[in-house]
Amino acid sequence: MITEGFLARHHMGRSGMKGPALLDVAQDYVLKHLFEEGIFDLGVVLKGGTSLRKFRAGNAGRFSTDLDFAAPDATTAELLLDTLDEATIEGVTFRLINRTPLRATLLIETPLGRPDIPAKIEVSPRRLWLAPEMLIPIALPVHGGYEFEMPRLPAPAIEEALAEKLAAWRRRRKIRDLYDLYWFGQGVLDETLVRRILMLKVWHDVVDDGLGIAPFDPLEVVADFDVAKLPPEDIGLLTQPVEPARWLTAVRHRYMFVTQLDADETTIAHCSPGDRWPVQQLLNSL
């Protein structure tokens, strides 16, 4: 395990940041253990905010307290949790509590103590739709204190990651989703692909998972919003400065392309169970 000096360097001595920084480091030990146990060879992919930080932003991104994975099926999802529960790597021990078949609370013990913030792990029993990219996490100074090198791991294509974030922003208004959309939308994107995947994800959210009502108007995603109503989160510990009003303005402008639906996407927007066959055909064409 890293030394206190490496950890202090990681959180730059900022008050209240030791817990998030220790959790961020412990997540790397989780990934290394799962890699060594062959879990990623089974089609598992790290997704969500932690994936974006590890593979796309490094120290420029926010700390993400949760680990979200995509797995090809529920059996693999449960195997992932079984593999992690009561595991130890280089003096770091993991234990799962409040466990259900696909999610749990993650408890971590390290030689430097236990992170003082809650961490969750969740596994979706559905494959990603686009082929993942094999990436090595962005090199950080703290990695110099590890007993191992970070392995190359599967990460979602940026277009699918952002489409999933847009779908999440539709379902809930969380400042972490707003920040991720702002930060990762600054580069060049295949806008047509992002929009197509967003429409398909929302269709599945509404029809299969009961998350939201039909029809879906993509203007919801880029609508104005009173940022004062965003639920409180620890975003202030994770990134500076915290400017949700500026982020929202940028997000509304950057993602306006999601409203420019073609004929197929206009059909999908109805979120009708009767459209399952054409939806599947569009998925197959991705």
What are the language-model segments listed below?
Residues 1-44, 55-67, 71-286:
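Structured mid-to-C-terminal alpha-helical surface segments
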Residues 46-51:
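Glycine-rich beta-strand-to-loop/alpha-helix junction loops that act as flexible
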